[in-house]
């Protein structure tokens, strides 16, 4: 159990530092879109997809490596990667309606909660 905790901890730290570095370098390119954030979200989605596809074929590997990459690194880099893989699994299972619903709920739910936070902070 301690090796899994350490794996997630190390992966999360590395992902978080990489997210900070990429955002620092790229977010000032445009005042309209956070290019760094978009970049880490896309990179995280690619990495988690590649990682899970690899780990599904390589069952001999210690589960700590999978958790270091997915929960740790991609979780630290971005939570969008987890969201993406969940939607892809729904699509692969032929659950188009659920996939679309998941996309819409995550997108609009996140936007609404962020808006709520801004409204609440403005009121304080």
UniProtKB/Swiss-Prot annotation:
The chain crosses the membrane at residues 4-24, 33-53, 72-92, 100-120. It is a multi-pass membrane protein. Na(+) binds at residues 75, 78. Na(+) is not transported, but it plays an essential structural role and its presence is essential for fluoride channel function. Its main location: membrane. GO terms for biological process: cellular detoxification of fluoride. It comes from the Bacteria. It catalyses: fluoride(in) = fluoride(out). GO terms for molecular function: fluoride channel activity; metal ion binding. GO terms for cellular component: plasma membrane. Keywords: Cell inner membrane, Cell membrane, Ion channel, Ion transport, Membrane, Metal-binding, Sodium, Transmembrane, Transmembrane helix, Transport. It is found in: Cell inner membrane. Belongs to the fluoride channel Fluc/FEX (TC 1.A.43) family. Fluoride-specific ion channel. Important for reducing fluoride concentration in the cell, thus reducing its toxicity. This is Fluoride-specific ion channel FluC. It comes from Photorhabdus laumondii subsp. laumondii (strain DSM 15139 / CIP 105565 / TT01) (Photorhabdus luminescens subsp. laumondii).
